[in-house]
């Protein structure tokens, strides 16, 4: 530890990022209660102004939106990152009676870190003893689902996905939505707990929720549910502190990150992860091989199954919800990458490829896969089967190495399912638009509809600094085709470690992609927010336009750059067209004129009817004597 690190006592000094705890404008946190009082599902309600009288003068109902920000945006909750978030799930877990509280950490490395006095100032102070399944028990959500059990987590996500659709339907808000094309997905009109159970039992969806992460607000990943996004954080050997990573977490979930992966490769990985999990209301994923490699000083050849196994247990007992495991990088596939333009670009994939070649043995993650499953089901950690041979350039898309690994991931999925372990599949990468659907179709075929989770894909390689856009295009497409979760890409992709601003930009870009996919699939209620914003735009309700958007702050700032006065917030124009050429304003004038013409037409028509009646009463004579 450096002198500066020794001087910092995080258990005394750590503070929440103040930007992350500000409520959104005109929004309030609401909770929908389930069948028991401790099932309280958070949503964000956006209040709207009334329609101005010159537009008809009507009230506008509040709009509910999916909320990933956890307690951070609830003004009634006092946030102290030194103590972690409120417990959501412990009562549910204890009631099932199939877990036990351990006397202490069971991983060698975890015990070693705990006994290192020098780390005391960096360590999260309020660590619980971990839970584990009782001997012979399986505590995965898939196992419960296959036993016909609807867990509290399943009911929670059903309420969360449903977003009070029944009320919206009764109000007629679902009538104004285009029909979608879902490419074979089976999206019901209402998400019920039983439907959630069926999807998890079938393997088409997962609820990543480790029994040692009781702070998590359950969410679901699957093609028949809302498209989700993941944001990456994590330190590197070149920088970032524990506080900075926790700030990135809280910042990311504020803007809509459904899950977060901690990809730390620098110092204090164990301690950083503990702070992140204890303060995260969303599932946390990791790539355990990264930390295992740090334990052998970066020498891939020195990795062993025993070391990796201890790392899995260490992270599972901290509460990691899903592991990226690169078990599909087989020895026979490595030569297939030799003629690629960019070779193997996955860090985990390259680590395992190097190990295989150095020992001329099969990937130990593959040969020990059943043993990995035994660990996963003891803590309910979900698999995210890594695509270690994903293409790193569009020239390498859809090649033999990529699809060979995908077929192996399909085999491993079936093994995981035999253990009742939840599983999703990671995908590319760099893929031109015309080849994206082939990726989705092949994944559905090989992996029997297990959820697909892709990095983009990037649709062109010519835009360093703008790869959030090149990948957002591919993400929207593959989300429409059936991808369940999209891993964000920031503007710093290929260039450097993202900061807070980059994290926000990446998340907003991917929220756009995911929402566009939901619209295209015809997900019930997906268009409600669009319709509300469009109506506000037409009625020049500027504040409502800002607040209904994914990023109210940026929308308001852009508007105020040229029209900063408060009076501009009620003006019937913006600086793009000015008062004379605003198409919305002109349309309103056309409507008013048409209404007047229509009124004149009605008067003329009424007069003509009266004259016709008089003509008949007078005998229908064309001429009368004077």
From Swiss-Prot:
GO cellular component, one term: cytosol
InterPro entries in UniProt: ThiC (IPR037509), ThiC-associated_dom (IPR025747), ThiC/Bza_core_dom (IPR038521), ThiC/BzaA/B (IPR002817)
Keyword 4Fe-4S on entry: yes
Enzyme nomenclature, EC number: 4.1.99.17
Binding site for substrate: 232, 261, 290, 326, 346-348, 387-390, 426, 453
Compositionally biased region (Polar residues): 10-22
Start and end residues of each stretch annotated as Disordered: 1-22
Enzyme superclass (EC): lyase
Cofactor note as given: Binds 1 [4Fe-4S] cluster per subunit. The cluster is coordinated with 3 cysteines and an exchangeable S-adenosyl-L-methionine.
Catalytic activity as recorded in UniProt: 5-amino-1-(5-phospho-beta-D-ribosyl)imidazole + S-adenosyl-L-methionine = 4-amino-2-methyl-5-(phosphooxymethyl)pyrimidine + CO + 5'-deoxyadenosine + formate + L-methionine + 3 H(+)
Chain sites annotated for binding Zn(2+): 430, 494
Record keyword rRNA-binding present: no
Annotated keywords: 4Fe-4S, Iron, Iron-sulfur, Lyase, Metal-binding, S-adenosyl-L-methionine, Thiamine biosynthesis, Zinc
Pathways per UniProt: Cofactor biosynthesis; thiamine diphosphate biosynthesis
Record-linked Pfam families: ThiC-associated, ThiC_Rad_SAM
Example of a GO biological process term: thiamine biosynthetic process
MF (Gene Ontology): 4 iron, 4 sulfur cluster binding; carbon-carbon lyase activity; zinc ion binding
Needed cofactors: [4Fe-4S] cluster
Chain positions recorded as [4Fe-4S] cluster binding sites: 574, 577, 582
Family classification: Belongs to the ThiC family.
Free-text function comment from the UniProt entry: Catalyzes the synthesis of the hydroxymethylpyrimidine phosphate (HMP-P) moiety of thiamine from aminoimidazole ribotide (AIR) in a radical S-adenosyl-L-methionine (SAM)-dependent reaction.
PANTHER family recorded: PHOSPHOMETHYLPYRIMIDINE SYNTHASE, CHLOROPLASTIC, THIAMINE BIOSYNTHESIS PROTEIN THIC
Quaternary structure (record): Homodimer.
Name of the protein described by the UniProt record: Phosphomethylpyrimidine synthase
Organism: Pseudomonas putida (strain ATCC 47054 / DSM 6125 / CFBP 8728 / NCIMB 11950 / KT2440)
Gene that this sequence comes from: thiC
